Curated annotation (Swiss-Prot):
InterPro entries in the record: UPF0637, UPF0637_domain_sf
Protein's UniProt name: UPF0637 protein Bsph_1379
Pfam family, one: DUF1054
SUPFAM superfamilies to which the protein is assigned, alphabetical: YktB/PF0168-like (SSF142913)
Family as reported in the entry's similarity comment: Belongs to the UPF0637 family.
Length: 211
């Protein structure tokens, strides 16, 4: 049964001053939920995509001064890491919950991945207008897919292809006020439905479905 219910306390972790204090709150309140989601959705991805997926809960281990502004659990078919691969994420900023598929600048084949997405524009027509896209995983900002279809979508994909720091994220952002009202069952259902919609994108990105 779904177990994860988000609260204001979870989101307010990212308003706590100080690295140690914020990390302690993150470890106490948020990371246990990410670990649970990691177990649940690693099984989901392994079943849906036909290879073993592993959860990676953000550790923020390199931080020595500035506290993290967001945190997440990522999913990829590699036990030792995820950043060099296209990967799925569930995470929080202080303002919203995010459920996304991401290609970040550390992916060595991101130019090829971008070309595959550019060659399949019809994929984006299959998503509802409440989906978002972004070109920066370190920013909470995003643009609605409906608005991006005019010209920003192609611009983001070309940047992913041509610019070393180019990135591409697609999925849903759920504002804090909405996320905290979701029951555990509603959140699980929304997350699974979002990922179901993103699976065809993943298959195209990794070259599994290039019809």
């Amino acid at each position: 049964m779904p177990k994860i219910k988000w609260t204001n306390k979870d989101f307010n972790v990212f308003k706590i001053d100080g690295l140690e204090q914020r990390m302690n709150a993150l470890n106490d309140h948020v990371r246990p939920k990410f670990h649970q989601l990691g177990d649940d959705f690693a099984t989901y991805f392994s079943s849906k995509l036909g290879e073993e997926f592993f959860p990676h809960v953000a550790k923020h281990a390199r931080r020595t001064v500035n506290p993290p502004q967001d945190s997440w659990v990522a999913f990829a078919p590699y036990k030792r890491g995820y950043k060099s691969l296209p990967h799925f994420q569930i995470g929080l900023w202080h303002s919203h919950l995010f459920i996304v598929l991401a290609i970040i600048y550390e992916a060595p084949q991101k130019n090829v991945m971008a070309e595959r997405l550019l060659a399949h524009p019809s994929l984006f027509e299959q998503l509802s207008d409440d989906f978002i896209v972004s070109g920066d995983h370190m920013s909470p900002e995003a643009i609605s897919l409906e608005e991006a279809k005019e010209d920003k979508l192609k611009e983001l994909l070309l940047r992913l292809r041509d610019v070393k720091k180019g990135e591409f994220l697609i999925g849903r952002h759920i504002p804090k006020d909405q996320a905290t009202k979701l029951t555990a069952s509603e959140f699980h259902q929304l997350t699974e439905q979002t990922f179901n919609s993103l699976l065809p994108f993943y298959n195209v990105i990794v070259g599994k479905d290039l019809k």
